[in-house]
Amino acid sequence: MRVLKKTSFGLMAIILVVLAVGTILQKIDSSAVAAYTSPWFVALWTVMAVSAVAYMLRSRLYRRLPAFAVHASFAVILAGALTSWLTSEHGTLRLKDGAEASAFTLDDGSVAKMPFSLKLQRFEIEYYAGTEAPMDFVSHLSTDGVNGTASMNNVFSHRGYRFYQSGYDSEGGSVFTVAHDPMGIGVTYAGYALLLASICWFMMSGKSRFRSLLRKLSAKPLAVVGALMVAMSAQASDLPALPQQQAEEMGNLYVLYGDRICPLQTMAKEFTEKLCGNATFDGLSAEQVLSGWLYYPTDWSKVPMIKIKSAEVRRLLGIDGKYASVRDFFSDVNEYKLEKPLRGIDRFADPQGLREAAEKFDIINRLTTGKSLKIFPLKDAEGKIGWFSQGDDNIPVETDTQEWMFVKMSLSYANELVQTGRWSDLSDFYTKVRKYQRKNGGATLPSDTRFKAEKTYNTVSNARPLAITLMCVGLVAFFSFCLLSARGGRPRRWAVLTLRAIAVAAWLYISVIIVLLWFVSGHIPMSNGYETMLFLAWCAVPIAMLAERRMPLALPMGVLLCGMTTMVAMMGISNPRMSQLMPVLQSPLLSAHVAVIMVAYALLAFMAMNGIAAFVMRMRNRAATDEITVLKEHSELLLYPAVMLLTIGIFLGAVWANVSWGRYWGWDPKEVWALITMIVYAFAFHRESFPWLRRPMAFHAYMVLAFFSVLFTYFGVNFFLTGMHSYA
């Protein structure tokens, strides 16, 4: 039996190494992903699975039926994957309007015949109102007398063949992903169903280790110390800009920005954040900053407010600090300093930094030339409403002369009012423009409620002060609690109540941000790095409050985790910009997949902080073995729901992927690292196979080290590796 144990766990360790190395090699050579579907790697999985099943039987795991069912479900899932690898066909089919085909191109370039012909009756793109952002791709199909449609997240199935709308080509034809997997999907889904049922069975079983720990651990009065608040200050500015009243009136206009109609305030806020990293600059609001660049470009071109992160680009521009002015982008003979490096960007030392600097210069250039202010709604010959700027050359030819002059000359008139200081006339001008927008914008305009909600969101969404406060409070509370516990002391009740109040207030504030973001964007806010980190911060507090009775250290941990994740969100890990969702992302399965995994990550973070707390206690008092053992039991208790939720989240993502593009596992780096994380933490369940995990300090060390896989899954993949999940 020892040989079987070493074989199964040894092969799993080898598989983990191959998985991790493969994701890194994909960054260098995209063809490296082929290793995951190669015969030798499939054989490695097969031998591991067979040896693991044999080890389960020899160790009589079947005497603990819930645990046996969990392990058996993974064997069924792997059997389904093997069946798909042996029998399935995947490829691409391109059809033009009115054309039909009875074959498709496989991934390896060969051609596979279908037992029927498929005809594309019509293909159409549905757009978000008033924009050029695609909302859905819809193909109307017919075959064997059967009519149907294929669109994003809506599969057309016929005789075992599944057709997924993946896009369209330059000639207006439709592009489908074709999947023919009549056996593998059924086996795999059966494994998913067995996994879900067995997880529920295990968690409810009275004989499981989880329930044993739940009964054993009882609440003990422990708490935390008080809070440290941070004050923020602002200063007045001498830079030329609109007065606050007129700037707010300008921000109250509608504008086409980010493929949607929103308050111009939103554009101003993100314009300012993009340039300098904050929503305000030198005591001026975002609307005032935008107005300064719009009406006083010469003065503002001298101001060093463009944040340059790259040291290489700073050297190229010849600046000493981190901020550049527009004039720094030009030489003494008026040559654009980035022009030549951009031509040979592959040879530049920091191409990403160069692109970011060029993008910041470009958004200023587009604003000052009037191209980015698309504030004028106009109808074309078909009655379709589009939004245009003063600098656009594609204004509909049907536009009458008076309206054409209004579009082309109104901002010049506004500039004249600004230069002569006629502020009341400027207010009247903005009022008239807004009336024009409401009269001609039609169905493209957001509702008044949504418009006001977005302005409220813009006002409250800067959570940096909150994040700083929570991190300071959480750090002081966390380490104070650890030191008190090591000495056998208790913090005062008022400190605990204060910390609870801070945690609840923070949770309510973040809840307001999330609800506003959800309402304004029209989708669950889990589509990018900013939104998922904000959701993780939101999860941290209720988890801490629920766990506090049995694990008192959870409260300061929750405050600290909430602060750290909020700060990461505010640092702009994904440029927090609301935009219309890509069609493939409009799925409730995706939202459930992200939400479940984020809750799992929050639990794993608590376990890592438990480990850190144990090491702090050990350094302060080597006799604090009882407290360290209790922390270990708390981490063990959290380990079960954390890994179970992570597992469910991974396979929810697999189902979503299969529904969306016909492949429930595509070896994307994010998928691979989520799998690595799940396996790494699953090792910790096997105390019988790894007796050293029973030792408290060894267990805590493993939990701290294992959390690095979570960090790499989120940050490493998002910002260093490539793939469909990369946010950077």
Predicted regions span which residues?
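Solvent-exposed, non-transmembrane regions of integral membrane proteins
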Residues: 1-728
